Amino acid sequence: YNGLPHVERTLESVSGLETVVVDHGSTDGTVERVRAGFPAAKVVEQENLGLAAGWNRGIRETAAPYVLVLNSDAWVVGDAVDRLKRFADGIPRAAWVAPRLLNPDGTLQPSVRGFPTTWRIATEYLFLRKLAPRSRLLNSFYGAGFRHDEVREVEFAKAAAFLIRRQAFEEVGPFDEEFFLFSEETDWSYRARAAGWRTLFYPEAEAVHVGGASWRRESGTLFREQVRGHLRFLLKHRGVSAAEHARRVILAGLRLRSVVFRGERGAVYRDAADWVAAGPATTLLESTR
């Protein structure tokens, strides 16, 4: 959606591969630019039904045994696609292989994550993880200081760029389109693990991701979707009680953040807190965006 100015670099990085571009009603000329500059790419236009819906559509438009999924603000480095495929070929139960993510300036963009629990939500929203970034107790939500330099099975990884095995996609099922913008990868990896599949981090392949470089991309709407994704995951996989306890923890954390931070950032947290306060969790997840 509105992928300029990065989508051209995204497509150049996978030149020569079968390419599907799913557009969610862009108004910035993305579709026209892609069709003019990359005539071999298949462009699929649909209304903005969310990230999960776009991934599902793109994967279904090809019959390839592996599909590399890229955000429109991410691109692979060098022969990363070949590296990911060769690695996956050697591990038959590898459902999802994540490359190491870099910021545009070449610095590491941490991407390994842990499945949400009420406690892990508390460590995030109450800043407990800041006390001991490498602690498994206080920072498992963000990988407990994982160095991102070793091959490792992980709970899930940020989905700006990833290789997915079609066999796993067919067995586990599509991405849950109830997750509009956040936590769809979390949910899918959780279901994949339950079905005996593995999510792996492979640092020998790299991709650049622009979106993670600044919190300012988290407008009030985007931040609310992040909170909604966390609550939806907990409701789906941990139950009503866990989701409601998490909602109360999130509310306390957002109230704290709205005091600590000033200006635009503080306003984002205040608006999100007002929305969370209108709970319970089940009602929030039924509300329109």
Region annotations inferred by a language model:
Residues 147-149, 155-206:
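A short, conserved alpha-helix in the catalytic core of glycosyltransferases
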Residues 46-62:
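Glycine-rich, basic loop-to-helix element that forms the pyrophosphate-binding segment
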Residues 116-154:
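Short, flexible, basic/aromatic active-site loop/helix in glycosyltransferases
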Residues 77-111:
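Conserved donor NDP-sugar-binding/catalytic core segment of glycosyltransferases
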